[in-house]
Amino acid sequence: MNLTSFSDTNILYFFFRFFLLIVVLINVKKISKTNKVENILKFWPTILSYTLVSGLRWGRPYDYNVYYYVYNDIVSGYGRTDNEPLFTLLVKIAGAMGCDWQGFVIFMSFVLITSGCYFLKSYPQYLTLSLPLFCLSLTFAENVMRWYLGYSFVLIGLSFLMLKNDYKKFIVFSLLGFFIHYGLLINIILLLLICLIRKPLNPRVAFIIYVCVLLFFSMSVFSQLANVVSKINIGTRFLSYQENAQMWLDADMQQSTGQTGLFTFVENLFFFYGGYKLCSKSPKFIKMYNIAVIACIFYPIAMQLELLIRINSVLYMFKYIVMGFLLKDILLNKSYYPKYYLNLVVVFCIYYFYSLVFHDAFMIGSEHYFIWDADGRKTLGL
């Protein structure tokens, strides 16, 4: 990390992330004293803080600039006719209300954090670490905004599936998400299949598969699919994806970010076994744990391709949620876990502060612009 590359925007972004962390910690301190949270309004400090920190960004990441034109085309009636209907409807309603693109960015940030708080409100005693980790881990959502806007509805539906096995409400909310972004169909199917697993995944088996993926998986298998995908007739809506299949499915044509460090390796090992112990004591976490384990195993593969990153990222968020549950449970039930687990709580808290607050703010080559940096510009340029 090059310390000389820090700019005013990096420093300001760091303080905003730190401010968000403090607000969320204060908020959950009050909420965690109750056994059940009936009203989502109790999360208003978290919702407001995240909405402002995320929603007031400008020109970043890439999709912010692309969707500025998509949004205005739809509002003016010049947009493509085969856009997802619910996304088009939301944009047209926002446009009719006089909302510009920046206002819609704020709206999407609000919907995402509200859905997350709605999902987590049923676990008030475990929110101390899980809600801060959830909020701080949503950085990638800023790059694939429409994907996460749709997933916000899927997440609300998932809360009914987790707590009450209510598949009807899950399907209804998932359809809302699907009609915002058709690509979520894969996530919806995966979530349904994973939630059918009634037992926590064996940590030893999970770890062995994870190691095999790290050591032996070759991305060339996806490159071979490119020619096949480009020849399948699945309608004009996906024509651009098919035409660019080689780009989406060939790791050599993208920047590879799929390196897994030693600490991440140790972290996943701890998560597999610690999460399994948590689920053995509290079965209500089994579905979330299984989603997170599969996301961890798939992570080294997914990080090689943007399309797979999108699919895996909304599953990977459950690692942070369940890890927050696990670390909190270790503090609440010290005698249930090995003694060294308590020391690891401190280690992981420091690590997450570094990786999600400090490192995210000061990555090389990243300028974290906000609306006051626009200087009259509508976008950063493409």
Predicted feature locations:
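TM-lumen/periplasm interface segments of multi-pass membrane proteins
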Residues: 1-9, 13, 31-108, 355-382
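Alpha-helical transmembrane segments and terminal signal-anchor/GPI-anchor hydrophobic tails
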Residues: 41, 60, 65-69, 74, ...
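Transmembrane-helix signature of polytopic, membrane-embedded enzymes
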Residues: 117-135
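Membrane-interface alpha helices of multi-pass inner-membrane proteins
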Residues: 137-139, 169-193, 296-300
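Short acidic/glycine- and proline-prone juxtamembrane loop motifs at membrane-interface regions
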Residues: 142-149
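Membrane-interface transmembrane helices that cradle and orient dolichyl/undecaprenyl
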Residues: 154-168
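Signature aromatic-anchored transmembrane alpha helix within multi-pass, membrane-resident enzymes
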Residues: 207-212, 332-354
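Hydrophobic/aromatic-rich transmembrane helices and adjacent perimembrane loops
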Residues: 309-326
